[in-house]
Amino acid sequence: MSPEPDGLLTAAGVKLGQKAASKDEAVQQCGELLVSLGAVEPAYVDTMHLRERSITTFLGEGVAIPHGTDESRVFVKRTTLAVLQYPDGVDWGNGNETKMCIAIAAKGTEHMQVLSSLARILMDSEKAEELRSAKDVDTVLDLLQPIAETDE
């Protein structure tokens, strides 16, 4: 059964309680989820690693936003988010620990709207903590609803 492209962020795109031994492994998991959602071609995952090697995608508040390079848009089938939570944290380098990865696949410039909405959410430290420590998918979907609405 193929995934239904029913929105920027769906329950199928949220994975809680994940584990990754490294930043590379976490980025790989993010990319593989985007592929399984039918949002990107497998080649997009390689560009996510390239982006991470050129500039960190760590955003702050324990959140990273893995995404591909500008040139990788050709591998994007539809704009989608994938959210992976790492309760034990992942070393993102430079003393930064990530507990939540919000992977972005954008066909155009939608990623700028997504980043803007995400920044507003993370500026609220209570919401940021709620997001990092979420125990169920619905909580994540509710907290990230403002981002999902940027698709409309």
List each model region and its residues.
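Cytosolic covalent-transfer regions centered on His/Cys nucleophiles
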Residues: 1-152
